[in-house]
Amino acid sequence: MNQVALVTGAGQGLGARFCARLLAAGFDVVVSDRDFAQAQACAGQLQGQGGRVLAVKLDVASKADFEQALAQVLEHFGALHVVVNNAAVTKTTPLMQISPEEFDAVVGVNLRSVFLGCQVLGAHLAEAGYGRIINMASLAGQNGGTATGAHYAASKGAIVTLTKIFAKEFASRGVTVNAIAPGPIDSPAVHAAVPAERLPGLLANIPVQRLGDANFLGDLIVQLARPEAYFTTGATWDVNGGLFMR
């Protein structure tokens, strides 16, 4: 039986790409998104590319939605093994122009979603005695922001810490929790945040002189989702072209 992986914010962009890579690696995939029509469309495109696919509606700011999504997954597949907390809002508002409401809205999606995903779905994985959780952080959360807003960067930095906290919580119960911190990736979100006229300047500042490969991120998720990844937990995996080196 295939393992089952749920990806949040998977109706488009990187989330959809991650679903495709997981399918190609032999996982059954749950495409979850706040926009159910988008999740359904993505699931339809993925049909026939590997394992079984299920679309579910999931507002990642809602604990009740996570609980309902888990119930749907268990009813459909009978199990859940892997969680990819990918959903995020990207804002580029200048620091001194960010309103308290906008700050709360960004943190309320980017950080709250990881907390709820780890808490609700992680509790189920821990009870089952096995699981893999991968949280999408960002280079912006490590170096104080890049082309993104301070609220985005702060939320992504907090994900790195939250990853360690949940990794400690679940370590003895067969569940690993890791984060991936991408730099600029060749993705719709990056191209939307960086105007075409600024792209050459961005590339010039990346040591490898290129944007990152979205498929590689998906393949890294696959590796961290494997049973053999049991000895890797609480780590943040940097994929940034040399922009941030430990």
Residue positions per predicted region:
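Canonical Rossmann dinucleotide-binding motif of NAD(H)/NADP(H)-dependent dehydrogenases/reductases
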Residues: M1-V30
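Substrate-binding pocket helix/loop in short-chain dehydrogenase/reductase
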Residues: P94-L95, E102-V107, V190, L202
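Active-site helix of classical SDR
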Residues: C118, S155, T163
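Alpha-helical segment proximal to the catalytic Tyr-Lys
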Residues: A123, K164, K168-E169
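Residue(s) in the substrate-gating loop at a strand-loop-helix junction
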Residues: S138
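Short C-terminal tail/terminal secondary-structure segment
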Residues: N143, V222, T233-R246
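Short, small/polar-rich loop/turn modules that mediate ligand/substrate recognition or access, typified
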Residues: A171, T176, T232-G234
